């Protein structure tokens, strides 16, 4: 049996590109790279985002076991979670083009963000934060609360209330939602990250390639669930993580296997003539991938995928191009659909 990747029309043979554990950085090396990524983002990205969103102070307050989603993008590689109550404050001086990063916490926040909290001078952590804010006298104080984006809605009510209770009335009037800043911080990749991301995508496709090969799939024997758990095991052996459970489903001439991620696959055993679809991603070096691919299982008398599948892929790719050609800044998805 040979599998055919419809996505780029390459026949899979027994010889496949395999991603091995030695291609993955050690935990120690990963820590070094993550620190470099974070420093690059602090130095080159955050000042730009704060200036463009008009927030000159961004305060992130989070607690152990109940972390703000944004804090997970900032955690030093030696920190697996926040510690007790962790407070970070970023102040951008637009005139001086300078970003000050501080932690109002018991410890420095890794190598990039020093702690400035002197408990002997001010034992109350929240009062120490307010003192720092007053010294900087920002125009806008951004906090992570949002009606629309969960990733930008990380501050809990108790911390929000505690902060405002310690602020003067004039200072509390400066508090605004950091929604736009938080979302842009999450969605924006630096040049350094994009170079690394290419490697993540290569690793992801390598795992899919191996999963869609005769090393893993024997038609008439292997189930879609077998492939799913092979992928999970492969990721574990490589020392990586998945950030969502993989999906493997089958499309046939009969009713397609569209179970919408909420049930068991109707087509359990993979057979010749099946079109296999996967949705799979990994987490590595603070980045996530999310890749989907198709593979066609050749019938015994076939050497290539049927013409109708090849044409269907071409049409699907054409639709993708139509959509992407209409992408414009601040244009909504519904607007693009209407124009397409």
Which sequence ranges carry the predicted segments?
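Active-site neighborhoods and metal-handling regions in enzymes and metal-associated proteins
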Residues: 22-340
């Amino acid at each position: 049996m040979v599998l055919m990747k419809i996505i780029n029309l390459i026949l899979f043979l027994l010889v496949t590109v395999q991603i091995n554990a030695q291609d993955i950085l050690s935990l120690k090396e990963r820590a070094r790279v993550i620190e470099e990524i974070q420093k690059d983002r602090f130095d080159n990205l955050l000042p730009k985002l704060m200036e463009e969103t008009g927030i000159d102070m961004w305060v992130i307050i989070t607690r152990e076991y109940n972390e703000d989603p944004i804090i997970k993008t900032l955690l030093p590689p030696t920190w697996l979670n926040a510690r007790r109550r962790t407070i970070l404050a970023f102040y951008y001086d637009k005139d001086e083009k300078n970003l000050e990063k501080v932690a109002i916490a018991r410890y420095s926040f890794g190598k990039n963000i020093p702690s400035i909290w002197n408990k002997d001078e001010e034992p109350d952590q929240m009062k120490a934060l307010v003192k720092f804010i007053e010294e900087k006298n920002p125009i806008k104080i951004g906090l992570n609360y949002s009606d629309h984006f969960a990733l930008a809605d990380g501050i809990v009510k108790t911390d929000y209330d505690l902060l405002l209770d310690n602020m003067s009335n004039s200072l509390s009037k400066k508090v605004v939602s950091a929604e736009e800043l938080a979302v842009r911080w999450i969605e924006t990749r630096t040049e350094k990250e994009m170079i690394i991301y290419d490697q993540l995508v290569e690793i992801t496709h390598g795992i899919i390639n191996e999963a869609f090969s005769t090393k893993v799939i024997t038609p008439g024997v292997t189930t879609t669930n077998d492939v799913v758990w092979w992928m999970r095991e492969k990721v574990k052996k490589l020392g990586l993580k998945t950030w969502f459970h993989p999906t493997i489903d089958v499309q046939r001439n009969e009713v397609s296997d569209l179970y919408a991620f909420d049930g068991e696959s109707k087509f359990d055993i993979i057979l010749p003539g099946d079109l296999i679809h996967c949705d799979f991603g990994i987490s590595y070096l603070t980045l996530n991938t999310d890749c989907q691919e198709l593979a066609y299982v050749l019938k015994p008398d076939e050497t290539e995928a049927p013409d109708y599948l090849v044409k269907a892929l071409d049409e699907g790719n054409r639709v993708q191009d139509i959509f992407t050609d209409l992408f414009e800044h601040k244009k909504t998805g519904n607007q693009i659909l209407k124009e397409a």
